[in-house]
Amino acid sequence: VPTIFIENDVIAKSTTEQLDELAKNTVSLTEKFINDKLKANSNDVLRCNEIQIDCDWMASSKDRYFTFLKAIKKYSDKQISCTVRLYPYKFTKEMGVPPVDRAMLLCYNLLNPKNHSEKNTILDLEELKKYVQTDNNYPLPLDIGLPAYSSCYMFVNGKFDEVRHAVPENLEEITVEKTGKLWYTVERDTSFKYDYYKGGQQIKIERVSAKLLLDATKMIVDNVVLDETLLSEAAEKA
């Protein structure tokens, strides 16, 4: 499914006319991408029946964002979906419900890595539970997005410096000691897998294990009302 990410600031600072033009251009360019790039081996256009919009909207920008989504639906004959983070999933009265055909619930990036030093901020079951254990049944068919990536947070003199993704499996080999649950100290200045690490630098490595994904999936299935089609497909693949 082609997914288009749009910054919330773009939505928040646009007029109704600009949002309409943005929607028109978004649909046009996406259709061109599908026709030009997504070719099957037989040279037929790969079937694509859905366009997904990804935007971390806020309560203050929801009206503009929903106006944009309505315009997307106006200009496209495809099913329109959008991503929904856990906060708007739980607090629908504050955040509203997007005017789309279905939603992708993003169950990752639950915490700010700068503020939660000892937790896995990509996926933490205690934090996930706070959002999925709710009496609020979301009024859209839901798909689920789970993390399949890793992150390495770099700190210099105790201050956050940068983040790197797709962490090499054996990155721990360049560390001299483990200083916390997820924390390591780089042994010496090292070039490793095309990246440079400075000796003495603190790094926090976050990965998502298969067990953690399975535990998160069980929690979601037990608490979130999912599309029956999605559940049937998952059962067939199990």
Protein language model features and the residues they cover:
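Chitinase-like catalytic core of GlcNAc-active glycosidases
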Residues: 1-105
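Glycan-binding loop/region signatures in secreted carbohydrate-active enzymes
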Residues: 154-232
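Well-ordered, non-membrane alpha-helical segments in soluble/globular domains
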Residues: 16-29, 67-70, 119-131, 213-236
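Substrate-binding surface in catalytic domains of secreted glycosidases
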Residues: 67-172
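Glutamate identity and glutamate-enriched acidic tracts
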Residues: 7, 17, 21, 31, ...
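Short, exposed beta-strand "edge-strand" segments with a Pro/Gly-rich flavor and a Y/T-containing core
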Residues: 13, 116-123, 202-208, 224
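Acidic-enriched, low-complexity/disordered segments with a strong bias for Aspartate over Glutamate
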Residues: 7-9, 20, 36, 44, ...
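A structural motif corresponding to the C-terminal end of an alpha-helix
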Residues: 32-47, 75-76, 130-142, 227-237
